[in-house]
Amino acid sequence: MVPVLLILVGALATLQADLLNHKKFLLLPPVNFTIKATGLAQVLLHWDPNPDQEQRHVDLEYHVKINAPQEDEYDTRKTESKCVTPLHEGFAASVRTILKSSHTTLASSWVSAELKAPPGSPGTSVTNLTCTTHTVVSSHTHLRPYQVSLRCTWLVGKDAPEDTQYFLYYRFGVLTEKCQEYSRDALNRNTACWFPRTFINSKGFEQLAVHINGSSKRAAIKPFDQLFSPLAIDQVNPPRNVTVEIESNSLYIQWEKPLSAFPDHCFNYELKIYNTKNGHIQKEKLIANKFISKIDDVSTYSIQVRAAVSSPCRMPGRWGEWSQPIYVGKERKSLVEWHLIVLPTAACFVLLIFSLICRVCHLWTRLFPPVPAPKSNIKDLPVVTEYEKPSNETKIEVVHCVEEVGFEVMGNSTF
């Protein structure tokens, strides 16, 4: 049986090679080529084989070329193809019939079709669209224990009127959902959307399509599409039940995996130990969910852990959020620091007490009596001063010193 199949394959290859070398064999382009939007950021390309194509029992293929919004090309044996791409700028594609051999490829002419861009005034569509997802507990735990929440934010178009209102939709697979919970700016325009639970599969490889359109009485609002990889926007939850214990000079840290549909072995962890006293940060990359570290007994430490999904379970993603900090230890002064603080304080206290005792008991007067001032007899002498009316040119002051009993007359002075 196997030799027969090999003979048939060889014969077919020989026939195709002969056809390619035959100048009269002509490939005709497909017919009825159409492009139809089948969902948010999704189109279906369909065509039919040319009914006038000569049939010689050969395997015809089709070469599809995407011209806009982003160039791409591929081959297919089917007569239809599905494309996932933003459509707010329109879509254009071409297709042709091809016949391949080991040496060359014969191709027909191209046929093209396009999907025009939706109407709307320039500058009215949203900008800076960003989305993130989180794993949450499902409301139907017996069917599906985990679901995914979705939050998207955007900026209002620079030329959008003040009465513009935006509306968000997302599509994942065949399911489409409209946003019901919005956040608004000062002009009451929607600028963020929140889905507490969605149909998104955080383990899936399908792209998430987000579509935002709008309405206004003053202008036509141009819609906007954007595709997201669930892996790229998945925000891993922080590890749960982080516990920290201190025994002697050892720090024992343990935690549980984040709330996630992935099992325990699918996570890598990063541990951060921050010494609040000296500012030193210790970071450790771990696979296990426990860690032991040596510490001193005079510092306080802040402990945090975060997680990321590892490569065995899916393509590595970004790190998730840090867990809430846990503070352990009691900050105490070292012996040298205590000496530097206690000794000067004690010295000042002793001096203050001694000063108060001396003041109360008059010890300063007893220890350091005041030196008596020398006695002066001159102060005891009565002095009489007489004034005479001076002339116009001369002023004369006469001072008489009167001698008392037991004192020597000091004399008279005249100026």
UniProtKB/Swiss-Prot annotation:
Glycans are attached at residues 32, 128, 213, 241. A motif (WSXWS motif) lies at residues 319-323. It is a single-pass type I membrane protein. Residues 362-415 are cytoplasmic. It is found in: Membrane. GO terms for biological process: inflammatory response to antigenic stimulus; regulation of interleukin-5 production. Pfam families: IL6Ra-bind. The chain crosses the membrane at residues 340-361. Gene3D superfamilies: Immunoglobulins (2.60.40.10). Expressed on eosinophils and basophils. Also on B-cells. InterPro entries: FN3_dom, FN3_sf, Ig-like_fold, Short_hematopoietin_rcpt_2_CS, TypeI_recpt_CBD. A motif (Box 1 motif) lies at residues 367-375. The WSXWS motif appears to be necessary for proper protein folding and thereby efficient intracellular transport and cell-surface receptor binding. The box 1 motif is required for JAK interaction and/or activation. Cell surface receptor that plays an important role in the survival, differentiation, and chemotaxis of eosinophils. Acts by forming a heterodimeric receptor with CSF2RB subunit and subsequently binding to interleukin-5. In unstimulated conditions, interacts constitutively with JAK2. Heterodimeric receptor activation leads to JAK2 stimulation and subsequent activation of the JAK-STAT pathway. This is Interleukin-5 receptor subunit alpha.
